[in-house]
């Protein structure tokens, strides 16, 4: 499963109402660290395709959701399970850090 883009309008359907845990990458095109973490997020999406959904949301184009979740710096990666935010990772982190965080929420 590839990474899909979500918007303010599709966030509830794609993230909150999803049965799988969802990794949400809050990013913007001008953000250097966001571009650095993007390949890591893509690799995670491939490796965990049967157990999680991975989505990206452009904070410039979708300010409502970014404000709702208090996004102050990007990249911010949030994990949602059963419609609730269960964890947050801020900044461009190594794949190992992101994987170990995700593993806590995969049953």
UniProtKB/Swiss-Prot annotation:
<feature type="active site" description="Nucleophile">
    <location>
        <position position="31"/>
    </location>
</feature>
<feature type="site" description="Contributes to redox potential value">
    <location>
        <position position="33"/>
    </location>
</feature>
<comment type="similarity">
    <text>Belongs to the thioredoxin family.</text>
</comment>
<dbReference type="GO" id="GO:0015035">
    <property type="term" value="F:protein-disulfide reductase activity"/>
</dbReference>
<keyword id="KW-0813">Transport</keyword>
<feature type="site" description="Deprotonates C-terminal active site Cys">
    <location>
        <position position="25"/>
    </location>
</feature>
<feature type="site" description="Contributes to redox potential value">
    <location>
        <position position="32"/>
    </location>
</feature>
<dbReference type="InterPro" id="IPR013766">
    <property type="entry name" value="Thioredoxin_domain"/>
</dbReference>
<keyword id="KW-0150">Chloroplast</keyword>
<feature type="domain" description="Thioredoxin">
    <location>
        <begin position="2"/>
        <end position="107"/>
    </location>
</feature>
<dbReference type="Pfam" id="PF00085">
    <property type="entry name" value="Thioredoxin"/>
</dbReference>
<feature type="disulfide bond" description="Redox-active">
    <location>
        <begin position="31"/>
        <end position="34"/>
    </location>
</feature>
<keyword id="KW-0676">Redox-active center</keyword>
<dbReference type="InterPro" id="IPR017937">
    <property type="entry name" value="Thioredoxin_CS"/>
</dbReference>
<keyword id="KW-1015">Disulfide bond</keyword>
<comment type="function">
    <text>Participates in various redox reactions through the reversible oxidation of its active center dithiol to a disulfide and catalyzes dithiol-disulfide exchange reactions.</text>
</comment>
<keyword id="KW-0934">Plastid</keyword>
<feature type="active site" description="Nucleophile">
    <location>
        <position position="34"/>
    </location>
</feature>
<dbReference type="GO" id="GO:0009507">
    <property type="term" value="C:chloroplast"/>
</dbReference>
<protein>
    <recommendedName>
        <fullName>Thioredoxin</fullName>
    </recommendedName>
</protein>
<keyword id="KW-0249">Electron transport</keyword>
<dbReference type="InterPro" id="IPR005746">
    <property type="entry name" value="Thioredoxin"/>
</dbReference>
<dbReference type="InterPro" id="IPR036249">
    <property type="entry name" value="Thioredoxin-like_sf"/>
</dbReference>
